[in-house]
Swiss-Prot record:
GO annotation terms (biological process): chromosome organization
Assembly notes: Homododecamerizes. Interacts with terminase subunits TRM1 and TRM3.
Protein's UniProt keywords contain Disulfide bond: yes
Name by which UniProt lists this protein: Portal protein
Record flagged with keyword Cell membrane: no
HAMAP family: HSV_PORTL
Localization: Virion; Host nucleus
Biased composition (Basic and acidic residues): 760-769
GO cellular component term of the entry, any: virion component
Length: 769
């Protein structure tokens, strides 16, 4: 109110006065709004951030700045959606967005308003109609069940009334629940959804809404009209149903109208402008161009770099991004900074070397001189030379050099060979050749034979290789076609991935994927490590990921602490300290639910807010609890008490009933029915409670003197005679102990009986013990 007064005092134009006046009217400061109890929560900022201010110059006027959408504000919404990861603590936000409390508040509002419309006259008339139809009025109950005693008759009357009360309650609540159900289709989760309201508060602390002019064409919702037609039968049976159902329908119609006349603007298509000089916030829809008003729960703060919002996401966003960056760094380290191939090298002991290696060493000799001259070393040298060949023509030279080196050892006895024998050719039979000519021919023939044998073997091997190569070409052609198809499909998927941004998962771009794919393999040189006594035991891939589990755990705890303390939530734990559930507390209901109905919907028939215990109750339990708090319960209690008193009076009026004698020997005053005439009823009229109740009272706490209330004697001459004969000067009997009382009451009973009989003309001698 002080802010509005300052507007009047400081403004020079009529526009500011009109603005302040409209704000005061909208906020119910003139006393017409029943929700003034919540005004103080938002009076400063709600009055300053008023609707319909400056739209004529907005946003061309100097001083306006865009505060949403920005990179920061859109980042808040992504964090809520889990785009930067999701932790256990963030799950508490689902409890904040739950509409359970709003639904319970709507049910309580409709039920309480409807039940408070009950009139006492209607309830009394319905009760009288019921007992007359069932013949259960007080006189009938006393006549039929009075013989069972006064207490039993009253207990029966109580049960009769409770039966009718339960039936009435079930009938009313059933139809009221049906009326409330018609409200759920009106948009509690739609354009004016409570979840959207909470999202705006959690992100920026501001809720922009668009209102439309109230029209008379809204009328009553169609489902409600249908249901009210079905409730006509109940109205014919119960008079109280007319006012109750009419009030309930009126409340539902009012709430539906409030929901239809307002819409909470969407987060992704709304622009928020802030005027620092005038301290105003405006909202505008990007698509429709509609301008709306703003409910500012927590005002923003202007700093050098822009605007800082006073919201939970503003405080949590830095930690969320830091933890996300750490996880991304771990993934980059996994992909880029870690050598994927590791080699495990083992050392051999002398005893672990294979048998073939020891055999080769033994054959080749123990020292280098022996190895150089041994046939085994020459054979190994031949194998190495064959392995290092680059052309097929090198085979002849390699074999000839080996044969020249070893020919003297292989053909040492070739001089005694007679080459003139058949099989060595005619050229060798000449006389001039001699012994040396024969030896040379043998060596040449041996070399030629060995070379031809190796060439034949290699020719067959090469032919097999050509066949294998032809087969591999066919297989390679097929694999090439399949690879090209897969590459084309992969390229198409990458292009689609670039066009459609994923809401979750990896944030690696196309260029980054290309760079990762083009990475060269890391070459590890093991020449200096692996020797003759070493071997490669195993090779494996290893992924190094920097640990970030502690950071995620800390972030989860931050989510829990911020949401619970900011929204005043109530955490329910078991005996072991483990969290079972998170729910709204009474402070949460006042912080979120009350402004939602008061300032967003502007509901004028809200009534009392639901409590924390009522939110967790079932629908049936909530209805019963509200029924007990409504004025209907008070009316029914009064009708019940009056009905029980009527039954009690009727039982007393019809005289005493035969009851068992007291445990300590008091005689029953009604033992002889002829002693007391029917019209007089001496015992009940004179002593009011009877001997049974009197004896019970005296047995527990026997008084020294017992006052017996006097009866007005103007109605009967007989009672005057009784009083004159038995009354003492002070109108009291002395009661010394229970035995004296017993005998005196016995004597008084006899004398009272005889006196009454004399009064009616029955003369009889007093029987004395």
């Amino acid at each position: 109110m002080a802010e509005i007064t300052s507007l009047f005092n400081n403004s020079s134009g009529s526009e500011e006065k009109r603005i302040a006046s409209s704000v005061s009217i909208d906020q119910g400061l003139n006393g017409s709004n029943p929700n003034d109890q919540y005004k103080n929560m938002f009076d400063i900022y709600w009055n300053e951030y008023a609707p319909d201010i400056g739209f004529c110059t907005f946003p061309e006027e100097d001083g306006w700045m865009l505060i949403h959408p920005t990179t920061q504000s859109m980042l808040f919404r992504k964090i809520l959606a889990g785009d930067f990861g999701y932790t256990d603590g963030q799950g508490i936000y689902s409890a904040v967005r739950s509409t359970e409390t709003v639904i319970r508040q709507v049910q309580a509002t409709v039920l309480m308003n409807a039940l408070d419309a009950t009139r006492y006259e209607d309830l009394a008339a319905d009760w009288e109609h019921h007992i007359q139809q069932c013949n259960l009025h007080a006189g009938a109950l006393a006549e039929r069940y009075g013989l069972c005693g006064e207490s039993e008759a009253v207990r029966l009357a109580h049960q009769v009334f409770e039966t009718w009360r339960q039936t009435l309650q079930s009938s009313l609540l059933e139809f009221l629940r049906g009326i409330t159900g018609c409200l759920y289709t009106s948009g509690l989760n739609g354009r004016v959804g409570f979840a959207k309201y909470v999202d705006w508060i959690a992100c920026v602390g501001i809720v922009p809404v668009v209102r439309k002019v109230r029209s008379e064409q809204n009328g009553t919702p169609a489902p409600l009209n249908t249901y009210m037609g079905q409730a006509a039968e109940l109205s014919q049976m119960l008079k109280v149903a007319d006012a109750t159902l009419a009030r309930g329908a009126a409340v539902v119609t009012s709430l539906v109208e409030c929901m239809q006349n307002v819409a909470i603007m969407d987060y992704d298509r709304t622009r928020l402008y802030y005027n620092y000089n005038r301290r105003l916030i405006m909202a505008k829809d990007d698509v429709t161009g509609m301008k709306g008003e703003c409910l500012v729960v927590w005002p923003p703060v202007v700093c050098g770099e822009g605007v800082v919002f006073d919201s939970p996401l503003q405080r949590l966003s830095g930690e969320v991004l830091a933890c996300y960056a750490l996880r991304e760094h771990a993934r980059v380290c996994q992909v880029l900074n870690t050598a994927p191939l590791r080699v495990l090298i083992g050392r051999r002991n002398e005893d672990d070397r294979s048998h073939s290696t020891r055999a080769v060493d033994r054959i080749m000799g123990e020292n280098d001189t022996t190895r150089a001259g041994s046939a085994a070393s020459r054979l190994v040298k031949l194998i190495v030379n064959l392995k290092n060949m680059r052309h097929v023509g090198d085979i002849t030279e390699t074999v000839r050099s080996y044969l020249e080196e070893t020919g003297n050892h292989i053909l040492e006895g070739s001089g005694s060979v007679d080459t003139s024998q058949p099989g060595f050719g005619k050229a060798n039979q000449s006389f001039n050749g001699g012994a040396m000519s024969g030896t040379t021919n043998v060596q040449s023939a041996f070399k030629t034979s060995v070379v031809n044998s190796i060439n034949g073997m290699l020719e067959g091997y090469v032919n097999n290789l050509f066949k294998t190569i032809e087969g591999l070409k066919d297989v390679n052609s097929d694999l090439t076609e399949r690879l090209q198809f897969k590459e084309g499909e992969l390229k198409r998927l990458r292009e689609e991935r670039v066009k459609i941004k994923p809401s979750k998962g990896s944030h690696i771009t196309m260029a980054e994927e290309t760079r990762i794919a083009d990475l060269n393999h890391e070459v590890i040189d093991l020449t200096g490590i692996i020797g003759d006594d070493a071997y490669i035991a195993n090779s494996f891939q290893s992924r190094y990921i920097p640990p970030y589990g502690d950071d995620i755990k800390r972030l989860s705890e931050l989510w829990k602490q911020e949401l619970v303390r900011c929204f005043k939530l109530h955490r329910v734990n078991n005996n072991q300290g483990q969290e079972i559930s998170v729910s709204y507390s009474n402070a949460s209901i006042s912080l979120l639910v009350a402004p939602y109905f008061s300032f967003i919907l502007r509901a004028t028939r809200l009534g009392f807010l639901v409590t924390q215990s009522e939110v967790h109750r079932s629908e049936e339990e909530l209805c019963q609890a509200i029924f007990k708090k409504a004025r209907t319960e008070s009316y029914l209690s009064q009708i019940r008490i009056l009905y029980e008193m009527q039954v009690r009076a009727e039982v007393i009026k019809r005289g005493p009933r035969r009851t068992p004698s007291p445990s300590w020997g008091l005689p029953d005053p009604t033992e002889d029915d002829e002693r007391i005439p029917e019209p007089n009823k001496i015992n009940n009229q004179y002593m009011h409670v009877g001997y049974k109740n009197l004896s019970h009272f005296m047995k527990g706490h026997p008084p020294e003197r017992l006052r017996v209330h006097k009866v007005n004697a103007a109605d009967s001459t007989l009672l005057d005679k009784i009083r004159a004969n038995r009354r003492r000067g002070d109108g009291r009997w002395d009661v010394r102990n229970k035995y004296t009382q017993h005998f005196r009451l016995q004597r008084n009973d006899r004398q009272l009986t005889n006196t009454s009989r004399r009064g009616v003309g029955c003369e009889r001698r007093d029987r004395r013990s």
